[in-house]
Amino acid sequence: MFDEFYFRKSLRPRESQNHVRNAACEYILKFMKTEGTIVKTYHLGSSLEPWGRKFHERIDRTVFDQDLTPFVKYTLNKKKRWEAEGNPDILYGLQRSYQNMGVMVAERVSLRSTPHYCIVSINNYYRNFFDQFPIRHLHQLQDHNYQCQSTNSIRGQPFKSLQPENRTPTQVTGHQQESSANVSVAYHIITPPKNYEVLRNKDFRVGHSDRNGIRTIARRRRFQFMKEAVFDLKNEILEDFGDSDDDDENEILLCEESCGPRKFYNLHDHLVKSNHNE
């Protein structure tokens, strides 16, 4: 009876019921409850000639600037009509707006970084940017037929993994399927998963932040490693400085012992005696 009472009292609660542990995660990631971003992009086929900058600016203001400005991040909460994700009617409406172009809607996952504060390399920026947010569902029209490609992973997969030729058990060599449309318009809807607290809870430590404002385990370990490195460096400097002083003192003592006692005389007496002799 005592053992049962002791273990019930001493054991920590489950992670889902551990409110002390979930406090930091819930407080820091509370913005993810209502966060949502939509980005519109267009992609050119390899058969088209490269377009100049002026041509891109012109078509951005005319052809592709019908509802959203391309390559601009919009808050999803302000675009209420995009709440119906995966609705085929949206795709058919977009297809009527963009004749002879491919249209797709990609639902992406934001878990480790937010689209508005994402640090990526400026070289090939948009490719590196979208690599940070894998695709969970890909909606598109093929010959006016609605298709949806999904993944079982809640964290999503890259665009290449969702292609039909890459999902078959046998890879076809020497033949690569090309898109029928030379120009494609894509709408990227970036939202966090519903269970983001469960997926990110292990990144936060128990309790509140310390005096350094450290709330995550990774950042605490990084700061601890930096402190240990600085401490070791200081010890090495002090040890080297102390060893040099000891060596100098030992050299002085050895020199005094080897030279023996020195003979001194008064220079004033020597000068006085010299003057009397003259």
Curated annotation (Swiss-Prot):
Polar residues bias locations: 163-179
Organism domain of life: Eukaryota
Induction profile: Induction by P.aeruginosa is dependent on zip-2 but independent of several immunity-related pathways including pmk-1 p38MAPK, dbl-1 TGF-beta, and kgb-1 JNK pathways. Induced, in a zip-2 dependent manner, by translation inhibitors such as cycloheximide and exogenous or P.aeruginosa-derived ToxA.
Entry keywords, A to Z: Immunity, Innate immunity
Any one Gene Ontology BP term: innate immune response
Region ranges (Disordered): 152-179
Function: Plays a role in innate immunity by conferring resistance to virulent strains of the Gram-negative bacterium P.aeruginosa via the zip-2 pathway and independent of the pmk-1 p38MAPK pathway. Induced as part of several immune responses to translational inhibition arising from endocytosis of ToxA during P.aeruginosa infection or exposure to exogenous cycloheximide.
UniProt name for this protein: Protein irg-2
Naturally occurring in which organism (per UniProt): Caenorhabditis elegans
